[in-house]
């Protein structure tokens, strides 16, 4: 049996596969698009990639039994689908690679068909190796794990020392674009939908019409060959600038210099070894600078493997983590993109349109607002898992609950990554023309990020005071007098009582402009400010600490 995120013909499931006597079983089931409200783009990617993979196996002459979502006798769950296949085919044995999600592993381990679960060779760190790394450590930190992985796999190493003489070049990868913007951004290597993908889009529109998001401009790789082409395009065209601008954001530019291959990796269309090797080869050939290559490899070899280790070590209780006792419902605008704050409108709008946002948009825009607002972690987790095409639970949950929300109390991150709107202003042009001023914490034009930042520190002062890394931010909080704190608390309360939006601010459904590709999509503004928009006047600085910029952090994208 092959699951939707196991599309690797070289996996352990196919060891000793004999086409004369063996068969492959795959299934599309409603439950996998229902247990969280999967977005149209995410569901399209999974189903199209599965169908392409099944077709490729069939073209080899292999027997493939495939349950489609619209089959008359289709079952509702994967467990039911497996039982139906076993009843119909009566195999001598059922084998499958271990599921990447706790929910499915538990379901199959208890299944009466008793499938034999095989290790997942896709990953560069086994469960046993991560357990050995974690043994005896009071706290786990990705940086130390990453160095071990570099040494074990001989990646970016010159003998026994790291290439260039240091392990981490994150300090060199923090640039914003400046007033002129990103300049010419290399075009993304999108793939026009073929007949299979178009059929899936039509099926989902008829069977699951209420899915969030869109698939009108779906162009994600759905085959291994397409994924390899996307990797090659990134290495050649965008990797050289990736390091400098991996944290930067710009209106109307959803793709920038990022790789856009996480979905292909997480469906196993790409192998992390080939991805890491391609990046290192580019540096050694002089085609990309070391800081860019090291920063990218850290995402794949470091963060991606690390969050998987954290997930399996912390489950099953991890999904219920709520260390800060956050109880605010996730605002409805996360599902619509209709919100007056320009940064949220941009980040959420492109997320719904493409199923994609890069790691800083996820961590320091949508994730930051949920943290400061005090949104229920399980609801935020469901949103991230639903919306993004690359979201699978083992990688999404630790990034969302641990990095973005600090709901795990410090398992993933050493501190909450809290900041005012000034961080977003520094790293993007989102604040230009926005009605809210990131320098203000109170008043009708105060940025909600800034208001909620100070309120967050005040509400959690006792807890955060036990964290030495929060000392500077709490010192700044102590400079605010009682009147300022009272005004901040009152505005924060009003924002929470109004579904996360300042009272009277209304909503903004779309941004318009000359760029037809962006103007048609809610929340996606053109690359320039909207015609007639005047710059927001700067208010007098007041309670303006931008917080601490995240370091050694990645929501892998």
Q: How would you name each of these model-derived features?
A:
Residues 45-65, 95-96, 354-378:
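Hydrophobic/aromatic-rich, well-ordered segments within soluble, folded domains that form packed cores
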Residues 62-77, 336:
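Glycine-rich phosphate-binding "P-loop"
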Residues 163-291:
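A charged, amphipathic alpha-helical module
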Residues 62, 69-71, 84-88, 92-94, ...:
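A structural signal for the main folded, soluble domain(s) of proteins
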Residues 2-5, 27-28, 67-69, 96-99, ...:
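Short His-Asn-centered micro-motif
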Residues 77-220:
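Beta-rich, aromatic/charged-enriched effector core domains that present basic-aromatic interfaces
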Residues 1-69:
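N-terminal beta-strand-loop-alpha-helix module at the start
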Residues 3, 229, 248, 252-557:
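C-terminal catalytic domain of photolyase/cryptochrome flavoproteins
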């Amino acid at each position: 049996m092959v699951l939707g995120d196991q599309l690797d013909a070289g996996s352990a499931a196919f060891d000793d596969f004999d086409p004369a006597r063996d068969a492959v079983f795959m299934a599309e089931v409603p439950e996998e698009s229902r247990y969280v409200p999967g977005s149209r783009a995410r569901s399209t990617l999974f189903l199209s990639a599965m169908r392409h993979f099944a077709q490729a196996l069939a073209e080899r002459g292999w027997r493939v039994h495939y349950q489609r979502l619209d089959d008359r006798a289709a079952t509702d769950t994967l467990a039911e689908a497996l039982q139906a296949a076993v009843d119909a085919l009566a195999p001598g044995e059922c084998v499958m690679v271990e599921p990447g999600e706790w929910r499915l592993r538990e379901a199959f381990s208890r299944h009466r068909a008793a499938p034999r679960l095989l290790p997942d060779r896709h990953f560069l760190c086994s469960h046993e190796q991560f357990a050995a790394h974690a043994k005896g450590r009071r706290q786990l930190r990705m940086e130390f794990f990453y160095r071990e992985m570099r040494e074990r796999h001989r990646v970016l190493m010159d003998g026994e020392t790291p290439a260039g003489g240091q392990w981490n070049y994150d300090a060199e990868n923090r640039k914003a674009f400046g007033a002129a913007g990103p300049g010419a951004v290399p075009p993304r290597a999108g793939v026009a939908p073929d007949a299979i993908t178009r059929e899936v889009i039509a099926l989902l529109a008829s069977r699951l019409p209420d899915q969030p998001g869109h698939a009108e401009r779906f162009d994600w790789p759905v085959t291994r060959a397409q994924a390899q082409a996307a990797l090659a395009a990134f290495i050649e065209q965008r990797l050289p600038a990736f390091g400098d601008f991996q944290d930067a954001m710009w209106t109307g530019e959803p793709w920038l210099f990022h790789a856009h291959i996480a979905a292909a990796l997480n469906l196993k269309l790409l192998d992390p070894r080939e991805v890491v090797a391609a990046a290192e080869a580019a540096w050694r050939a002089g085609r990309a600078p070391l800081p860019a290559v090291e920063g990218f490899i850290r995402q794949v070899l470091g963060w991606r493997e690390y969050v998987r280790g954290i997930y399996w070590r912390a489950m099953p209780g991890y999904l219920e983590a709520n260390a800060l006792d956050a109880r605010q419902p996730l605002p409805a605008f996360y599902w619509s993109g209709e919100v007056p704050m320009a940064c949220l409108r941009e980040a959420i709008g492109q997320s719904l349109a493409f199923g994609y946002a890069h790691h800083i948009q996820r961590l320091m825009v949508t994730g930051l607002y949920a943290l400061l607002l005090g949104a229920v972690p399980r609801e935020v987790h469901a949103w991230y898992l639903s919306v993004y095409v690359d979201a699978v639970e083992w990688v999404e949950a630790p990034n969302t609950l641990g990095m973005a929300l600090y709901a795990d109390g410090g398992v993933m991150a050493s501190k909450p990554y809290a900041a005012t709107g000034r961080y977003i202003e520094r790293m993007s042009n989102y604040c230009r023309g926005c009605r809210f001023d990131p320098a203000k914490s109170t008043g009708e034009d105060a940025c909600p990020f800034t208001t909620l930042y100070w309120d967050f520190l005040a509400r959690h002062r006792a807890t955060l005071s036990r964290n030495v890394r929060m000392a500077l931010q709490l010192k700044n909080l102590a400079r605010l007098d009682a009147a300022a704190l009272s005004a901040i608390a009152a505005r924060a309360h009003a924002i929470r009582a109004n579904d996360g939006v300042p009272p009277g601010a209304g909503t903004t459904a779309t941004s318009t402009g000359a760029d037809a590709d962006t103007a048609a999509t809610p929340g996606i503004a053109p690359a320039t400010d909207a015609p007639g928009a005047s710059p927001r006047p700067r208010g007098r600085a007041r309670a303006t600490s931008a917080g601490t910029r995240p370091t050694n952090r990645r929501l892998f994208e």
